[in-house]
């Protein structure tokens, strides 16, 4: 069986449809050209590569806290999509419940966009997310997680770490941010998305300098707490990226087919509630 025939769930991707859902006027970055990817276009990509489901992540670029494009994709996706919403730290519980009823399974924390200080007062939100059985999808880079890890260690919420925690490969595995990430494995509530290599690798495709970090994460978290993701449609990518080569890459990074099935399918089914 090839990687294209194995059951798969893509756990980090975005949809952009500015013709139907215009970007905010004050958006810092407005995806354009090949960065635009509608739900219909993404569905064709998933069909072509045998991907059963996908977790859509609300982007700060273009839409920020406007989740309508993603919610429309979920509503019309016939059960194929779930979502991670972008919200204010002071969102009320009724609004969170409404998002959950619409197919949202968690909330995005993007310290690479907002900075660490933006989330220093988010402990109350974490508690409320845990009470509603919603998760956090956390994007950090470099040493940011070292500052935020204590808050997540105390909270009872499930956390999905985006893009391997975006370490700096040349800094080595003992860098504070990556060391903090490995330490979070002990909580049993933290999961890692093996994705977004182009966002942190210093080498070009096939990102050989990312592989030691992927292997360290698989060792610390095990395949039962790791997931795969494409990061389609590849915003701000410094080079052309295609879906197929990324699937080939995870086959190379996780060569054991039993472990790979857990990463590609069984773990996201269990954690995100997709049907298996």
Predicted segments, located by residue:
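Active-site neighborhood of phospho(di)ester-bond hydrolases with catalytic His/Asp-centered motifs
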Residues: 8-11, 56-57, 85, 108, ...
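Alpha-helical scaffold segments that flank or form the walls of functional sites
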Residues: 26-77
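Mid-to-C-terminal alpha-helical segments outside catalytic/metal-binding sites
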Residues: 2-9, 32-53, 216, 221-227, ...
